[in-house]
Amino acid sequence: MVVKVGINGFGRIGRIVFRNAVEHPEVEIVAVNDPFIETHYAAYMLKYDSTHGRFKGDVKFSDNGLDVDGKHVRFYQERDPANIPWAETGADYVIESTGVFTTTEKASAHLKGGAKKVIISAPSADAPMFVMGVNNETYKSDIKVLSNASCTTNCLAPLAKVVNDNFGLVEGLMTTVHSYTATQKTVDGPSSKDWRGGRAAAQNIIPSSTGAAKAVGKVIPSLNGKLTGMSMRVPTSNVSVVDLTCRTDKSVTYDQIKEAMKKASANELKGIMSYSEDALVSSDLNGDTHSCIFDATAGIALNDHFIKLVAWYDNEWGYSRRVIDLIAYIAGVDAGK
């Protein structure tokens, strides 16, 4: 079964989701909406990418859309999501990737245009969040608007799940060492709510807030209130790393932690988590499709209850692949499979 999908917002995640969809046999992008981009520019932005290289297929444009590998993709320029005629393209599922319509009420506007489900590619204040490999099996077909959480939550949640399932996670603090993103500044500029966030991204290590750790409690209820964290924005363009320092209920050695991660990555979290004992650096993970790459040689243990775990993630490519995987999964549930 091929699921027909629309994308609202052809920014960083919208374009990387599109590229991932081309590689996914169960998902076909049939429409894109972005009021700020014309079709010829959309084709250029899809074809060339400074981080992920040239698009491997064929991209052309016409007045009303893109032709990608011989398949036509309708292109709209509506500002109001309610006015996007998703139904005329057959797009049953819509990816909301503008970063603007992240609440259930705002994202529900897509339903007026004929979409059956809306997947928000960002954390949401009120829409149910799903992380593949962690809580996707709790999805029910009556949910119309859902969130794929954040890239950091998608890395941290599988990591925390393995610790909690095997050894009990009492409490933990997370730091994500995160590549800069489009919301940051190329040179110092005004940022009234976050003064540090207004400093030049490529010149500074910038402490920042993140709700990614607390969000784990929403996808793993037993960990609610047990995790919190912060972010350090660093001068790299892509790939980030989670540092989880936590206390376990059961006595455990670091070798036992490694074995649990290795086992999970080969079984229930296969495709979501991977395990590595190589001497990795961030650029080695550019384009990696996993949500969480456990770095077995980077972690340490203070004692048999207090450990530090390190896991990499491509915050663009890996996250975008999960958006597509989530759509394929919920479409299967909706179809009764």
Curated annotation (Swiss-Prot):
SMART domains in the cross-refs: Gp_dh_N (SM00846)
GO molecular function, one term: NAD binding
Protein name in UniProt: Glyceraldehyde-3-phosphate dehydrogenase
The keyword Acetylation belongs to this UniProt entry's keyword annotation: no
Location, primary (coarse class): cytoplasm
Annotated organism of origin: Coccidioides immitis (strain RS)
Key word Oxidoreductase present: yes
Positions marked as site (Activates thiol group during catalysis): H178
